């Protein structure tokens, strides 16, 4: 009996996490169909899981970045710049794709929803102002509020300062980083239970009946995200690596995107992405910086949301849009998306900025935001999945391309 119990425990702790997550997903759906009160009660499991991920993510970023920079060897190359360019190119490509799809399949809205009382930023300058203030945030406040721009700045600064410390101090920082990484792996093993709770409680409390009125809008939104995830991103990965991109793309969607879909938080998915980077044997000095940076500025899903909902409002009001204006909207949506992490409410609260381009009054723009909140069950989940999975995908693409280049140079040598 004891041997059977230990065998079961070993399968649970060392078995395929993806299969366990799929099992949790199916069980969550079944529970929501069988007993709504029981499904609502399991919401606590999901809340605890997301809370644990959010709690460990800031300290993970701080320790990993600090340790990697403090122990960085002189002359050792990192690949942050090409990854950042891929983030920006991916976000702009997503916005451009959303414009094209919205022109081919124009959507309209029923703007009768009461405007939300959340105040959006006044302009793109205010968004950038908020991001700059995040840079100089108090480090304790940055950790408490999960301000990843502030955490990155302090981690980089401390890392450079600690380069001049003695080896004992560097070893201590490395040990601390390894300890936090161990805790992260422990938390991630509870993903199947957390997703079981999230799925069952979401289906029990909201269902999907409220979404049917916005079926076409949702199809355009999710269709854009599918095109970006399965066509645009693989193309960018291929241009970087010159090899079949789909094994990497599908792995990232499966192991990062699925978890992000249910947690609906790029910050909470940072530990998952870090673990996947380690599994792919990527350069730790690179991914310890690029993953939290991606959670802040790599927002392809947000660019799609801003573009599609803005053009839906434009179509509803009968405002003509020419090609130059549509291209300008792509640029504005990409810039807004990169600042989405610095705005309470994320991408939805940046829609009024894009609407302002077309002279749409703020009252109507806020009704569009309210529509976004209604469809948020699916919109936010898909948006987070594409945002977070792309972080690890582009990081892996650049690292693998660099490894291939070094191997080729070694053969020539």
Swiss-Prot record:
Q: Name one GO molecular function term.
A: neutral L-amino acid:sodium symporter activity
A single GO BP term for this record reads: serine transport
Q: What chemistry does it catalyse, as a reaction equation?
A: L-serine(in) + Na(+)(in) = L-serine(out) + Na(+)(out); L-threonine(in) + Na(+)(in) = L-threonine(out) + Na(+)(out)
Keyword Transmembrane helix found: yes
Domain of life of the native organism: Bacteria
Major location category of this protein: membrane
Under the heading Gene3D superfamilies, the entry gives:
Sodium:dicarboxylate symporter
CC terms in the record's Gene Ontology section: plasma membrane
Would I find Cell membrane among this entry's keywords?
A: yes
Q: Which family does it belong to?
A: Belongs to the dicarboxylate/amino acid:cation symporter (DAACS) (TC 2.A.23) family.
Q: What is this protein called?
A: Serine/threonine transporter SstT
Species of the source? Enterobacter sp. (strain 638)
């Amino acid at each position: 009996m004891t041997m059977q119990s230990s065998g079961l425990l070993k399968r649970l702790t060392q078995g395929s996490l993806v299969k366990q997550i799929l099992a949790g997903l199916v069980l969550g759906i079944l529970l929501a169909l069988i007993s709504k009160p029981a499904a609502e009660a399991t919401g606590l499991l999901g809340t605890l899981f997301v809370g644990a991920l959010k709690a460990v993510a800031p300290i993970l970023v701080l320790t990993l970045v600090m340790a990697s920079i403090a122990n960085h060897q002189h002359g050792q190359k990192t690949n942050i710049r090409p990854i950042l360019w891929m983030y920006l190119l991916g976000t702009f490509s997503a916005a451009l794709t959303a414009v094209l799809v919205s022109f081919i399949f124009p959507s309209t809205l029923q703007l009768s929803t009461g405007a939300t009382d959340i105040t959006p930023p006044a302009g793109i300058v205010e968004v950038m102002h908020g991001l700059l203030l995040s840079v100089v945030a108090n480090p304790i406040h940055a950790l408490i509020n999960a301000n990843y721009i502030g955490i990155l700045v302090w981690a980089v600064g401390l890392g450079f300062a600690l380069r001049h410390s003695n080896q004992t101090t560097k070893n201590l920082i490395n040990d601390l980083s390894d300890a936090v990484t161990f805790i992260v792996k422990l938390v991630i093993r509870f993903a199947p239970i957390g997703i079981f709770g999230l799925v069952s409680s979401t289906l029990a409390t909201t269902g999907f009946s409220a979404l049917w009125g916005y079926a076409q809008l949702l199809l355009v939104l999710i269709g854009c995200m599918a095109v970006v995830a399965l066509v645009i991103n693989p193309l960018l990965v291929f241009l970087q690596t010159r090899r079949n991109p789909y094994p990497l793309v599908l792995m990232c969607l499966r192991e990062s995107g699925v978890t992000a879909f249910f947690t609906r938080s790029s910050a909470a998915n940072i530990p998952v992405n870090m673990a996947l980077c380690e599994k792919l044997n990527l350069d730790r000095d690179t991914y310890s910086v690029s993953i939290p940076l991606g959670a802040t500025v790599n927002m392809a899903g947000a660019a799609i949301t801003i573009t599609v909902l803005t053009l839906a409002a434009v179509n509803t009001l009968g405002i003509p849009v020419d090609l130059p204006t549509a291209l300008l909207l792509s640029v504005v949506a990409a810039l807004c998306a990169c600042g989405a992490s610095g705005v309470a409410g994320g991408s939805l609260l940046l829609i009024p900025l894009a609407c302002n381009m077309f002279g749409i009054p703020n009252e109507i723009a806020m009704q569009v935001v309210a529509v976004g909140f209604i469809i948020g069950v699916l919109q936010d989940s898909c948006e987070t999945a594409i945002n977070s999975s792309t972080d690890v995908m582009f990081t892996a693409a650049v690292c693998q391309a660099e490894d291939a280049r070094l191997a080729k140079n070694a053969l020539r040598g």
